[in-house]
Amino acid sequence: MITGIQITKAANDDLLNSFWLLDSEKGEARCLCAKGGFAEDDVVAVSKLGEIEYREIPVDVKPEVRVEGGQHLNVNVLRRETLLDAVEHPEKYPQLTIRVSGYAVRFNSLTPEQQRDVIARTFTESL
């Protein structure tokens, strides 16, 4: 069970008035904030806090879906040889359009460096 606490008395002055989440099942404490000595999100054994007195604070924990960043996929349906030929003979492919970072762009409008980058990223030997 997770219990929120505010330390009201401690031998270590850095712990005074700090806020923690105690996990009684694991015997661990997660620092929410402290004056010093502990960083936010530090997880330590409860015994490391030493002799303390505390008051419980209400913790409202709701299940939450946490998405770190997003996924993005650009699909270009063509062969590597087609892009390599477009680099060598751009006049043969005036309408060749590809997807780059979510945008449609004419392959011939890219710089040579960008064209090489697209070819390298689009076609790989293995994952």
UniProtKB/Swiss-Prot annotation:
Pfam families listed in its UniProt record: Gly_radical
Keywords for this protein: Organic radical
Sites of Glycine radical modification: G102
Known role: Acts as a radical domain for damaged PFL and possibly other radical proteins.
Protein name per its UniProtKB record: Autonomous glycyl radical cofactor
GO molecular function: formate C-acetyltransferase activity
PROSITE patterns for the chain: GLY_RADICAL_1, GLY_RADICAL_2
Gene from which the chain derives: grcA
GO cellular component: cytosol
Gene3D superfamilies: 3.20.70.20
Superkingdom assignment: Bacteria
Residues of the Glycine radical domain: 5-127
